[in-house]
């Protein structure tokens, strides 16, 4: 196409909106400005980033984590939500573990104790707040981690040579227009969901060669061509038998939006083109970043072409969304990353470069901004054995997450690649990435039409308990009834609520840690206790994507890590230390030992669980946790105060149809109806359970029709359980915020008996709460372990003004 030499060059003035705007557009521009302002004020966007201590684990280990919760356009630590929910999800999309963290001004720390019976596989860590659920779940924090169980076989593996590819094409701005040169992004994805490097050509429907293309190692790239009238185009990979992949069909009219970065000053160059066939050429270009309006332009397209140069400093740091409107309809859109280099610089200085095993290390940390001014912030540090842990230099970190991947939908593979200065092509790769991405945080048509997100989930500052008060006979909701709540964790709590017309009652923002025994007493408006409670289950969001199975091949680092893990397990089994134990002189005890066998009138089941043999049981808050993930075929699912349990393939007849097994406590059956709500087991301290017997199949025939779906028998240590019933009342255990647990970092300068134990930990040091002072400084110390290796440290965090920071350092440990 021959382009008229008359180009429109617009230099953005210091004001937010250009003075060249015509009067007839002012009302629309005002609508855009006021709408964006309302959106950011009334619908503030929260984000979460999790820093974990290492990239992979074995069953029985602990995932140490730090949560960074930010809100608003400038990523400042959030003061809105306090409750952060963290889920661990397996390859089948099932919830495996969940914790609640209490954020203090946007920062929280926690841990996930992995059961030693966990199956090997890829798992997903997911984190979100109640408020975030009002928007697209795709913007929850998600991270895949590998977990191995050396004692269990690896299932659902994926072969690494499965190279089935999907190739997609994305015209810049969204459209191809006949006769206008266009830039087209491409993305090649394999069967495992990750990008694959490809080469190929573009052909038309006659097989005529048009141009060649080549992707980067992440499977993305771009090429240019001029689509002709009525021609269909295809992309074809190098392989002879490769199937053709169609390009979008070019339109006869429309607009092409091209945005690049000036190599001289980093300014943004915007090119807008149309053709003679396009009649209405009145357009406006709107630039916004995270809901902040940067500017609005009204270019002149009377010559079908406009060139606009915008100074770099007119943009915020991060992704700017450029949207071209024709009238009030968006017709083209482009994302561009503007790097204002506002990230915090972290200088980490060990007092030495080489240390001996078990020697003290002192680290000095200094945080500064781009003007070398001190920065106060909150950070977390992980130090790992580099022989056991391969740290991907391009892995996601807090800077890449907040500025890039949290703004986009879908997996952003190796997002740290685009921020690693060692990658010379990172800017080109980032531009190719954004060519293949679409904006999803809000849709222009919806917000301009006043279609705001439905706020079904409130900002949550604590633990919420809600439900319905019902009549004991009719099961109808009771209005104006009184509900009294009593609890004693950590102090005595006495609260009252009045049920609404629909019988609903609520207690909001309860503050307790670990678990709390909750007692609810209800009465109707005549002060009678003829009521029952229907407590709301925890409403968990669905997990919409697929977690890819583990690859067959292990890296050398992973093999070394698993070997070391087995050694650590053997060492842990050989050395037991409890400094609280006092050894007494031997004494003779006269009496008889009472066997629990006669008490078990139904005998032994197909599986017996001795609770004393379950590691980590001291953290359990419900007896069902003894079964969770430990007995093949027994599935335990928690949903708020409700617990569902089933035995797969246990039914031996059609009698007693259903899915729930018979549950007994000290030989006393729990009625099946009670299992639909909060069952009596919830009021029993898990540490009071002595053993559990599981019956399935023909073994359960001893229970008659009641055992058609199997039977699970719990035996307490006293063996004298009797159900306690109170009219109009229930008692249950509720999960609170996770209590803080400190990472064990031995102090080898003070001799202790436990120090004879070999120390081959993969995570040498974990500190989730590092705060710099007014000068941007802090100092910390820890000790090396017995590994002779290079140790790698990863420091991440956030300034109190919302600037992300990440840095790495290393030191050597060797015997001298």
Q: What is each stretch, according to the model?
A:
Residues 2-583, 805:
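N-terminal, cleavable Sec-dependent signal peptides of secreted/periplasmic/extracellular proteins
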């Amino acid at each position: 196409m021959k382009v008229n030499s008359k180009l429109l060059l617009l230099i953005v003035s210091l004001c937010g909106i250009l003075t060249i705007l015509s009067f007839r557009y002012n009302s629309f521009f005002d609508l855009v400005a006021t709408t964006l302002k309302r959106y950011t004020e009334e619908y503030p966007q929260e984000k979460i980033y999790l820093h974990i201590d290492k990239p992979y684990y074995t069953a029985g280990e602990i995932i140490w984590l730090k949560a960074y919760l930010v809100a608003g356009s400038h990523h400042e630590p959030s003061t809105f939500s306090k409750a952060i929910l963290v889920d661990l999800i397996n390859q089948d999309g099932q919830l495996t573990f969940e914790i609640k963290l209490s954020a203090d001004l946007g920062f929280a720390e926690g841990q996930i104790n992995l059961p030693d019976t966990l199956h090997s596989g890829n798992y997903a860590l997911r984190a979100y707040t109640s408020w975030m659920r009002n928007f697209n779940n795709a913007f929850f924090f998600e991270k895949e981690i590998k977990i191995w169980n050396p004692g269990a076989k690896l299932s659902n593996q994926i072969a690494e040579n499965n190279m089935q590819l999907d190739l997609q094409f994305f015209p810049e701005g969204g459209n191809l227009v006949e006769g206008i040169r266009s830039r087209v992004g491409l993305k090649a994805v394999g069967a495992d969901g990750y990008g694959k490097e490809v080469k190929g050509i573009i052909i038309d429907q006659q097989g005529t060669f048009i141009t060649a293309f080549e992707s980067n190692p992440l499977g993305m790239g771009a090429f240019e061509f001029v689509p002709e009238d009525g021609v269909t185009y295809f992309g074809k990979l190098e392989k002879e038998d490769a199937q053709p992949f169609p390009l979008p069909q070019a339109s006869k009219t429309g607009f092409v939006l091209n945005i690049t970065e000036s190599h001289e000053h980093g300014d943004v160059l915007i090119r807008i083109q149309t053709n003679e066939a396009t009649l209405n050429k009145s357009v406006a270009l709107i630039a916004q970043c995270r809901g902040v309006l940067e500017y609005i332009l009204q270019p002149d397209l009377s010559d079908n072409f406009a060139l606009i140069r915008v100074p770099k400093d007119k943009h915020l740091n991060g992704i700017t969304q450029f949207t071209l409107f024709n009238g009030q309809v968006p017709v083209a859109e482009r994302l561009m990353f503007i790097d204002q280099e506002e990230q915090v610089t972290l200088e980490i200085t060990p007092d030495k470069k080489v240390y001996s095993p078990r020697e003290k290390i002192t680290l000095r940390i200094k945080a500064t901004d781009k003007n070398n001014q001190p920065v106060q912030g909150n950070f977390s540090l992980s130090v790992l054995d580099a022989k056991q842990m391969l740290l991907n230099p391009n892995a996601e970190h807090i800077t890449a997450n907040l500025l890039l991947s949290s703004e986009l939908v879908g997996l952003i593979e190796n997002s740290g690649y685009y921020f690693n200065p060692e990658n010379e092509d990172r800017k080109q790769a980032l531009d190719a990435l954004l060519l293949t991405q679409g904006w999803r945080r809000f849709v222009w048509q919806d917000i301009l039409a006043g279609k705001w997100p439905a706020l079904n989930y409130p900002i949550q500052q604590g633990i919420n308990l809600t439900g319905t008060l019902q009549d004991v006979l009719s099961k109808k909701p009771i209005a104006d009834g009184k509900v009294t709540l009593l609890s004693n964790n950590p102090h005595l709590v006495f609260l009252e609520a009045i049920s609404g017309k629909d019988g609903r009652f609520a207690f909001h923002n309860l503050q307790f840690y670990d678990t709390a025994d909750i007692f609810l007493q209800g009465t109707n408006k005549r002060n009678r206790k003829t009521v029952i409670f229907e407590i709301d289950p925890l409403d968990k969001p669905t997990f919409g994507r697929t977690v890819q199975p583990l690859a067959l091949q292990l890296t050398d680092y992973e093999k070394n890590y698993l070997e070391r893990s087995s050694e650590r397990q053997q060492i842990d089994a050989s050395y037991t230390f409890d400094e609280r134990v006092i050894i007494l002189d031997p004494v003779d005890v006269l009496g008889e030992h009472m066997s629990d066998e006669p008490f078990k009138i139904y005998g032994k089941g197909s599986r017996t669980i001795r609770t004393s043999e379950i590691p980590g049981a001291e953290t359990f808050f419900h007896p069902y946790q003894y079964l969770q993930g430990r007995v093949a075929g027994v599935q335990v699912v928690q949903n708020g105060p409700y617990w569902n349990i089933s035995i797969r393939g246990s039914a031996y007849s059609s009698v007693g149809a259903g899915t729930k097994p018979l549950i007994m406590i000290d030989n006393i059956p729990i009625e099946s109806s009670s299992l639909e709500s909060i069952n009596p087991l919830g009021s029993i301290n898990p540490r009071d359970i002595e053993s559990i017997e599981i019956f399935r199949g023909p073994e359960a025939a001893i229970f008659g029709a009641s055992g058609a779906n199997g039977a699970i028998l719990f035996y307490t240590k006293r063996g004298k359980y009797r159900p306690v019933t109170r009219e109009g009342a229930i008692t249950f255990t509720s999960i609170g915020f996770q209590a803080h647990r400190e990472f064990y970092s031995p102090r080898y300068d003070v001799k202790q008996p436990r120090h004879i134990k070999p120390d081959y930990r993969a995570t040498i040091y974990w500190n989730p709460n590092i705060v710099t002072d007014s000068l941007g400084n802090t100092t910390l110390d820890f000790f090396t372990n017995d590994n002779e290796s290079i140790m790698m440290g990863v420091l991440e965090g956030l300034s109190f003004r919302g600037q992300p920071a990440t840095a790495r350092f290393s030191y050597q440990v060797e015997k001298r």
